[in-house]
Amino acid sequence: MITVSKEDYLKAILEAESEGEAVISATLAHWLSVSAPAVSMALRRLKKDGLVRVHKDGQVRLTAAGRRIAHKLTLRHHLIERMLFEIFGMEWFKVHDEAERLEHAVSPDFESKLLARLGRGGACPHGNLSELESPVSRRRRGLLLLAHAEPGKNYLVSGIYERDRRLLEFLEDRGIRPGARLHVTGRNYDQTLTLVTGAGKVALGVSAAERIWIRTAKNNSHPTSVT
């Protein structure tokens, strides 16, 4: 039987993979805010159910069956986020936490209605696709992390990793959201970026810049900024 707890572990493994992390027990303890013994017990159950493999180096990988369940849950999460944003008008930086609470309560019938209304394609309010992408896959689409942006160039925000609500609110207050135009003006010795956004001049640390995917803007117009 697939319990809510098992679904959460499988989805966390898939999401951590999509952010380029090597998934080990400590990764899951951090992502799910649980203890190391709790992770060990959960992994034993998932392994017994044929949903994960734990390699000799400690890395945790989804089996084909585990990956199918994780993909199904991430699609449901994606649809709920889009429903909250596109239909109910909830702010983009709030929908992830709400979808986390709702995703296990959605019936197959309701999910099919969401699919019919919204479609399987399309990006969530954070700019991410329903099929979670690895960093390699994003780079193949011409994206790069804001942390690697070149000073003097203009970019568009393509997607933002969505788990950190405080970071999302911080970015929103500074005009950094999916679709926003950025002009990178400089990089300090500690890799802090200085930007101009629609909200004005912004300084952004490397840890935040590594959560934001961008693409090069097609023209050279700068954001309309507030000075």
Predicted regions and their residues:
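Short acidic, hydrophobic short linear motifs in intrinsically disordered regions
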Residues: E19-A29
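Key DNA-contact positions within bacterial/archaeal DNA-binding proteins
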Residues: P37, F93
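Short, hydrophobic-biased segments on the C-terminal half of alpha helices
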Residues: L43-R44
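A short, conserved structural fragment
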Residues: K47-H55
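Basic, amphipathic "hinge/linker" alpha-helix immediately C-terminal to the N-terminal HTH DNA-binding motif
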Residues: G58-H77
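Mid-protein regulatory/catalytic core that forms ligand/cofactor-binding pockets
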Residues: E103-W213
